[in-house]
């Protein structure tokens, strides 16, 4: 029904144009004089243009989107140029062009607007450019460009939506961090990697779950009694620089800062060629196994570009599940914006497993810890668990605190 009404509306407007020409001609014939005939001859080209416009194949034009970069980092400017090429130079009085923006771009400040009016006339090729000052992190999809034209009085209008799909991945911001490789101390704390250590297979540095083939003498009876599971001692030669990084995807106003700091940590570790695995659990679980190098960095950054604050399970549950799957020595890094009882629970489980744990709390500015957070911080520090409160864009030397 709506289609029929729309078609009837367009037909009515199309018939109105020759009717106006006939009326002005009759008026000129009856009235006579210069003014009457001038009005008629003035209406003839306008009327003919309005009659021809609906038959012009604007859809045959070629529309392209050209951007200033192929890859972006959050906060960078986005500049796009929309170009239109026509095969037939039909005269166009005006042309309204609008590049339809992705949802996350609509609230961004624009130096030049994504909608413009051009007066191409007989030109076959023309373009316009718009700019967005800072773009947000994420995967953004452009779908189409709308082009609209019409006659002088707006009686006839023609609008075409061109499909111009483009997808851009905007990577998270990061800060250069000076990373120092860490090794597990005999009990708690850390040692710098450039310190020469004497390896002694008679010294136990941790415990892990029992695996077939382990010697009877390796069983740690105290840990076995404490956990009700058979636990095996880990010895000094098993020490490594392996890192496992967890990001807390709990909804928070500081989630973007958490992503930025996590990206900075990941980049610092992998640029030093240290092996690292990465765990991110929200509505879906994402796990990157232990690896190093640029390939691992690229994969994790791609994930961090898309990650959302959509956690449905406590972080402590994710930490517990992952630690049950690994047996080799590994340093755990937790990145969060809230030092909650759940983080304390995760730290307690890591301590039971004799895992080295680093907790980084991201805050906007100093003195923002709540009374509960201060209480948990004091409790963890008494247990010699490293907890560091870091502030936005002041991340450079966070690892030097660990080595003290």
Where are these regions (language model features)?
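An amphipathic, basic-hydrophobic helix/alpha-beta surface used to engage anionic
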Residues: 45-294, 331, 335, 349
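Acidic, glycine-rich A-domain
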Residues: 267-404
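Extracellular/lumenal glycan-associated context and N-glycosylation machinery
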Residues: 1-64
């Amino acid at each position: 029904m709506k289609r029929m009404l729309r078609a009837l509306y367009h037909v009515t407007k199309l018939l109105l144009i020759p009717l106006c020409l006939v009326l002005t001609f009759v008026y000129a014939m009856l009235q006579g004089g210069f003014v009457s005939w001038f009005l008629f001859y003035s209406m003839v080209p306008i009327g003919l243009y309005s009659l021809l416009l609906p038959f012009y194949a604007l859809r045959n034009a070629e529309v392209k989107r050209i951007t200033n970069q192929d890859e972006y980092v959050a906060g960078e400017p986005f500049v796009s140029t929309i170009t239109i090429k026509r095969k037939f130079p039909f005269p166009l009085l005006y042309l309204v062009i609008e590049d339809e923006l992705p949802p996350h771009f609509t609230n961004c400040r624009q130096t030049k607007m994504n909608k413009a009016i051009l007066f191409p006339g007989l030109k076959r090729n023309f373009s316009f450019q718009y700019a967005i000052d800072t773009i947000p992190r994420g995967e953004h999809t452009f779908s189409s460009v709308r082009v609209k034209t019409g006659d002088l009085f707006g009686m006839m209008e023609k609008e075409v939506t061109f499909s111009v799909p483009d997808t851009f991945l905007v990577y998270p911001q990061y800060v250069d961090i000076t990373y120092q490789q860490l090794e597990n101390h005999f009990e708690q704390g850390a040692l710098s990697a450039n310190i020469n250590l004497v390896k002694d297979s008679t010294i136990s540095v941790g415990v892990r779950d029992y695996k077939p083939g382990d010697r009877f003498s390796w069983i740690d009876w105290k840990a076995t009694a404490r956990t009700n599971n058979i636990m095996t001692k880990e010895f000094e030669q098993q020490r490594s620089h392996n890192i496992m990084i967890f990001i807390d995807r709990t909804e928070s106003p500081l989630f973007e800062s958490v992503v930025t700091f996590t990206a900075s940590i990941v980049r610092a570790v992998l640029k030093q060629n240290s092996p690292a695995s990465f765990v991110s659990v929200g509505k879906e679980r994402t796990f990157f196994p232990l690896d190093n190098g640029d390939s691992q960095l690229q994969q994790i950054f791609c994930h961090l570009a898309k990650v959302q604050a959509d956690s449905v399970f406590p972080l402590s549950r994710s930490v517990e599940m992952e630690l049950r799957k690994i047996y080799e020595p590994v340093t755990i890094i937790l990145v969060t914006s809230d030092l909650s009882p759940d983080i304390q629970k995760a730290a307690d489980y890591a301590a039971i497993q004799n895992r080295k744990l680093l907790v980084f709390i991201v805050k906007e500015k100093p003195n923002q810890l709540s009374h509960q957070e201060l209480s948990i911080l004091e409790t963890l520090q008494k247990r010699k668990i490293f907890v560091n409160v870091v502030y936005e864009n002041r991340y450079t030397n966070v690892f030097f605190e660990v080595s003290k």
